[in-house]
Amino acid sequence: MSWQAYVDEHLMCEIEGHHLTSAAIVGHDGAVWAQSTAFPQFKTEEMTNIMKDFDEPGFLAPTGLFLGPTKYMVIQGEPGAVIRGKKGSGGITVKKTGQALVIGIYDEPMTPGQCNMVVERLGDYLLEQGL
């Protein structure tokens, strides 16, 4: 299965009638492996900061998580494994695997829990596959 198929079929899939706004799988180096059409253009520095938060949990808390034009307030995640962010009625979930970051961005009517489930399910699967 191609990386694009993972994004299209596993991240952008329908959950209780709702979809993520956008999603991507990005290497630890910031290289995009696959993304949905609406996934924001981001700076390499933004991915570097996300990776730093996985290594040093709490690193992003004072400044927020920036991805493209959006700043998310970092909320409770799982140190070293999952970063969650909130902005208005939407937010972001980032799951770290051995080689990649699985990223999902949502807005109402999708809930934070639905976004977490979709992103973390694929992230856990990739971890099981040694990726």
Curated annotation (Swiss-Prot):
One of its GO terms (biological process) is regulation of actin cytoskeleton organization. Phosphorylated by MAP kinases. Its main location: cytoplasm. Disulfide bonds join 13-115. SMART domains: PROF. GO terms for molecular function: actin monomer binding; proline-rich region binding. A motif (Involved in PIP2 interaction) lies at residues 81-97. Keywords: Actin-binding, Allergen, Cytoplasm, Cytoskeleton, Disulfide bond, Phosphoprotein. The keyword Ribosomal protein does not apply. The modification Phosphothreonine is found at residue 111. One of its GO terms (cellular component) is cell cortex. Occurs in many kinds of cells as a complex with monomeric actin in a 1:1 ratio. Binds to actin and affects the structure of the cytoskeleton. At high concentrations, profilin prevents the polymerization of actin, whereas it enhances it at low concentrations. Belongs to the profilin family. The variability of the residues taking part of IgE-binding epitopes might be responsible of the difference in cross-reactivity among olive pollen cultivars, and between distantly related pollen species, leading to a variable range of allergy reactions among atopic patients. This is Profilin-10. It comes from Zea mays.
